[in-house]
Design a protein with these regions (language model features):
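Short internal beta-strands
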Residues: 71-76, 107-110
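Sec/Tat signal peptide C-region and signal peptidase I cleavage site
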Residues: 20-24
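Short, structurally constrained coil/turn elements
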Residues: 18, 65-67, 100, 123
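Bacterial N-terminal signal peptides
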Residues: 9-18
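A cross-taxonomic marker for long C-terminal extensions/tails that follow the last structured domain
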Residues: 84-151
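Bacterial N-terminal signal peptides that target proteins for export
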Residues: 1-10
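N-terminal secretory signal peptides
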Residues: 25-72, 81-82
Length: 151
């Protein structure tokens, strides 16, 4: 093999690898931004605290809210009564306020609200009613590529 052919092969190899190297460098520069939907339907303060703790840990685990595109907590069924502000557990309220401050959306099932005769003003500030229902909202988010978690 001549020096000229060796140099030509080296050049061809480098040109072939350049796009892969550029793609790998781009991935390092652009951290993945996560989209997650959390599903809560079980009643009880302990369960709600556990789920909000999971949300907090998710945000911390990916390096902070800057690496999260969206997290939505969809609450329906008996779990929604846990979030009625009159008599709401203070620690639960503080946890919810903390994760909402990091961009977490609190979605309240419209069917559950109707079934339990709840109004939006009875729920924590920032709660979003889901008129189509909590399960339908979860389905829509999963279809949009959200990771589904039900701790």
């Amino acid at each position: 093999m001549t020096l000229h052919s060796l140099a030509s092969m080296t050049l061809v190899t480098l040109l072939a690898l350049a796009p892969a190297a550029a793609h790998a460098a781009h991935l390092k520069e652009q951290p993945r931004r996560h989209r997650v939907v959390y599903h809560l339907s079980e009643a009880g303060v302990d369960k709600a605290r556990f789920v909000l703790g999971n949300i907090h840990n998710t945000i911390s685990g990916v390096g902070g809210a800057g690496n999260v595109e969206a997290i939505e907590l969809v609450v329906h069924g008996p779990a929604l009564k846990t979030f009625v502000t009159a008599g709401m557990d203070p620690q639960l309220k503080a946890l919810l306020t903390e994760v909402q401050g990091q961009g977490v959306v609190f979605g309240a099932c419209g069917n559950t609200m109707k079934g339990f005769s709840l109004t939006l003003d009875q729920l924590p500030p920032g709660a979003h009613p889901l008129p189509q229902g909590g399960v339908v909202r979860i389905m829509e988010l999963v279809e949009q590529g959200y990771v589904y978690l039900r701790p």
